[in-house]
Amino acid sequence: MSPALDHTVSFEKYHGTGNDFVVVDGTEPVPYRGAFAEAHCHRETGVADESGAHDRRGADGVLFLALEDRFHPPRIVMTLVQPDGSFAAMCGNGARCAAAWAAARTDASEFMIDTQSGTKRAVVRGKPGGDDSADITVEMGRPTFEPRDVPLAADRDDKLVAEEVKGLEVTAVNTGVPHAVAFVDNVDAVDLDAVAPAVRHADAFPEGANVTLASRDEDGGFSQRTFERGVEGETRSCGTGAVAIVAAAKRLGLVDGDDLIRVSPPGGDLEITVPDGGSATLRGPVEAEYGGRLAARPEQ
């Protein structure tokens, strides 16, 4: 094998409430980032912990991160490549993992994260390592329901709020990426893999949409399940989806005010605020799992 094909790059594996990512320094030479993500994120043949301490293969995406610590606070340039090789403009849990990765390399506890959907501020409490997790809050920007921002089909000039799309009553909102949010009686009673793809590919969403289900819990929070565009399946957690739930709930009058709302995807609890006049926030734990080296140009 030629030296170019045999080249490997260092990586670390992080997860935020089960939403897991391969993290690679953005300065590492990876010639085809899409192919890299397709190979190493695969749930059956992708990245694995050689120690056996973590038995889940693959990942929900690859975070290519460039740390620019000459700024105060330090900046992180974040590029997320999904398992299908596509690029995502924003990922809430990915941004929280990016902040944890940077915190392990600096003495800073605050970072500015440059994403394709704008710059997000993150605050880190603690540093992940061993059995510890970091508590990280990231500002997510203001959710928008505007048709051009979601985006919705070009011939539509009104918001999509509590309308039926392919069998689900959904509300469309962009929280960095588009979400079709449906409130149901019990998220666990829905066959997500059966109902979500039709909505994800509906004509109403020319760029596709993540499909997020929510049901109200007894304590006033929400249970969550999300079928992610680019992953093309359910993930254990979706930060933009959690924010989308609270934004849609406010739009529909299910919650009001600026209070913190708990949203619980399968991977754990997240805390969300969607203020009337400011940026939404996403808070939750991040853990570092393991690291190693991966082929920079995996065989196709």
Question: Predicted segment positions?
Answer:
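A glycine-rich beta-to-alpha transition motif near the start of alpha/beta enzyme domains, typified by
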Residues: 1-133, 181-300
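Short beta-strand/turn micro-motifs at beta-sheet edges
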Residues: 11, 169-170
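Flexible, glycine/proline-enriched loop segments at strand-loop-helix junctions
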Residues: 88, 141, 148-150, 183
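Membrane helix-loop-helix hairpins that form the core translocation module of multi-pass transporters
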Residues: 133-143
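Active-site/binding-pocket entry motifs
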Residues: 143-145, 288
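Active-site glycine-rich loop that binds ribose-phosphate moieties when present
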Residues: 145-168
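Selected transmembrane alpha-helices and immediately adjacent juxtamembrane segments
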Residues: 170, 177-181
